[in-house]
């Protein structure tokens, strides 16, 4: 029975997920261009709240432990194992107080509504994994942003989703 339900629920989830991305893309643009970084950050937080809630369609729930141990107003490096799309939305939503910025592959900077815009304008580093010379200035730029503003940077060191 679960398997029978999983296919239509997966389609519904993917559809709703993509609709949220489409809805929030112009919202992010307006927030960033008319009201600045803080408004953009708030729009990204609400987008990710919607995406986290969308996961409930699949029966997914989140239990985050130890949030009281995450220091605020200090630069942080968050290193995680990349399991699924859920990683990113939960990190952005549940760690929004530490302003997570991502070190991401350059391909994600184009063509994905909301995601690409946020990566390009939200302070993340877009890395061309085939060009180390391009990566260094990007990493330096995000490191300075994180250090100067007490934000956090998130990196998935495996560089892609892990099977383990």
PLM-predicted stretches and their roles:
Residues 57, 61-164:
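Soluble catalytic domains of membrane acyltransferases
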Residues 1-63, 117-118:
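A transmembrane-helix-recognition feature enriched in membrane-embedded lipid enzymes
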